[in-house]
Design a protein with these regions (language model features):
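N-terminal, positively charged/glycine-rich alpha-helical extensions of SAM-dependent methyltransferases
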Residues: 1-15
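Conserved alpha-helix/loop element of class I SAM-dependent methyltransferases that forms part
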Residues: 24-43
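A short acidic, Gly/Pro-enriched loop at the edge of an enzyme's catalytic core
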Residues: 100-112
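A short SAM/SAH-binding and catalytic strip from SAM-dependent methyltransferases
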Residues: 111-123
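A short glycine-rich, Lys/Arg-flanked "PGG" loop and its adjoining helix->strand segment in the class I
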Residues: 125-137
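Conserved catalytic/acceptor-binding region of the Class I
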Residues: 140-200, 214-222
Length: 255
């Protein structure tokens, strides 16, 4: 596992006990993805990547009472937390797994899915191809990820100060579709913007830390403490602190 992947796993593993208290937006997005999946397919075998504490896991098992689900996460503590939190008996298995290197037989699953996990992939195009290969013909690859306008308030505040925040560059919906594996049809592709309200900018940063998502972009230089304080003051000066989540949702069906 690369140093970057180890870093991601450590951050999310450490956040397992605090994740649910701060993950309001993430929980909503997971439920909406499960609803979208249930509208187009009835899977018997499901693989979930980036399961976290189990928001999508629980929603899927509620929709599909006869399905079996394998919940995986790059951070083994997250996968273990999911298994304990979601009471599904033998219907649910959990394991540590890098979603970019899936360790299952090809053609095994009816549904492969993940909510707000793909933005952590180093090579999403290759990852989607590898995950798609695990599907039977007619199976669905479904995911949500972050889009271009995510945390735009933070970017704007930094730009006013001549600073570059270490926020990843996220794709547009069209750019995400360019990463669709060959042989897959678009069942659904949409975007929405959700807003996470905070009393101040520091509370926003602390919420990211609580869910393990406070890592800078890969190869980006973190802001100095002084620069970070300047951005915090700039955001607070706007008088209304909110964080935009630009959410991309795609459901692709294998021919």
């Amino acid at each position: 596992m690369s140093e970057r992947k180890q870093q991601i796993a450590r951050h999310f593993g450490a956040a397992a006990p605090t994740y649910d208290r701060a993950a309001r937006i993430q929980a909503r997005i997971a439920v909406e993805l499960a609803n979208a999946i249930a509208a187009i397919t009835q899977p018997a075998m499901i693989l979930e990547f980036g399961c976290g504490t189990g928001n999508l896991t629980r929603a899927l098992l509620g929709h599909f009472p006869d399905a079996r689900l394998v919940a995986t996460d790059l951070a083994p503590p997250m996968a273990a937390f999911c298994r304990k939190r979601v009471d599904a008996g033998a219907r649910l298995l959990s394991a540590g797994m890098d979603g970019e290197l899936p360790a299952f037989a090809m053609g095994k699953f009816d549904l492969v899915c993940g909510s707000l996990a793909a933005q952590w992939f180093s090579h999403p195009h290759q990852a989607f191809a590898a995950l798609g290969a695990l599907l039977r013909p007619g199976g669905v690859l479904a995911l949500t990820t972050l889009g271009t306008d995510t945390f735009q308030e933070w970017r704007a505040a930094a730009a006013l100060l001549g600073l570059s925040p270490a926020i990843p560059v996220y794709p547009s919906l069209a750019e995400l579709d360019w990463q669709r594996p060959p042989g897959f049809l678009v069942e659904r592709a949409e975007e929405q913007r959700l807003w996470d309200e905070h009393p101040n900018a520091l509370d926003f940063l602390q919420s990211l830390r609580s869910i393990g998502a406070d890592l800078p972009a890969d190869h980006a230089r973190p802001l100095s403490a002084g620069a970070l304080r300047r951005i915090l003051r700039q955001v607070d000066a706007q008088g209304h602190v909110r964080a935009t989540y630009h959410v991309l949702t795609v459901l692709w069906r294998r021919r």
